[in-house]
Amino acid sequence: MSSEFAATWLPAVFVPLIGLVTPAVFIVLIGRYITATD
């Protein structure tokens, strides 16, 4: 794998991945917090 390939390919994968995973993790943490304090 060349560095040029990684430079074009990694952001294209990680940006949407982070955009989907971050809210999902946030929701899970809130859900656990709510159930733990309930």
UniProtKB/Swiss-Prot annotation:
Main location: membrane
One of the protein's GO biological processes: photosynthesis
Keyword Iron-sulfur: no
Pfam families xrefs: PSI_8
Keyword match Thylakoid: yes
UniProt keywords, alphabetically: Membrane, Photosynthesis, Photosystem I, Thylakoid, Transmembrane, Transmembrane helix
GO CC terms: photosystem I; plasma membrane-derived thylakoid membrane
Subcellular location: Cellular thylakoid membrane
Transmembrane segments: 12-32
Domain of life per record: Bacteria
InterPro entries: PSI_PsaI, PSI_PsaI_sf
Entry's family note: Belongs to the PsaI family.
NCBIfam families: PRK11877.1, PS_I_psaI
Name this protein carries in UniProt: Photosystem I reaction center subunit VIII
